[in-house]
Amino acid sequence: MNEKVRLLKIRAKIKRKKPKFLRQEWWRFPKFKNDPKWRKPKGTDSKMRVKLKGKARSPSIGWSSPKAVRGLHPSGYEEVLVYNVKDLELIDSKRQAARIAATVGKKKRIMIIERARELGIKVLNAR
């Protein structure tokens, strides 16, 4: 458990330093600016592909978080999407936490939260 907390702190530190990886010339075209996603530069004369100083950074393995905590919630729990009360029975309260789906209504949401409290399961978006 102590190792997991240490790795989560390392991951938070890495994420703070990590730049936004935007595609080459994202500033030039509105369709790139409004939908910012990474695309690898493939041009033969591309300064970004050659990794010249002053050009935007490219994603590489060094920016990744530790494998043991990759994909976990910042609290250290693995997120499980819950649609009904029956889904709560499948959750291991020591390593997993529930996230109530967006499509669940108010009445069922209250039932899920009450049952989670009985089972000792953490709900990430209880409101």
Swiss-Prot record:
Residues 37-48 have a biased composition (Basic and acidic residues). Residues 37-65 are annotated as: Disordered. Keywords: Ribonucleoprotein, Ribosomal protein. One of its GO terms (molecular function) is structural constituent of ribosome. The keyword Mitochondrion does not apply. One of its GO terms (biological process) is translation. It holds the Pfam family Ribosomal_L32e. GO terms for cellular component: cytosolic large ribosomal subunit. It comes from the Archaea. InterPro entries: Ribosomal_eL32, Ribosomal_eL32_arc, Ribosomal_eL32_CS, Ribosomal_eL32_sf. The keyword Ribonucleoprotein applies. Belongs to the eukaryotic ribosomal protein eL32 family. This is Large ribosomal subunit protein eL32.
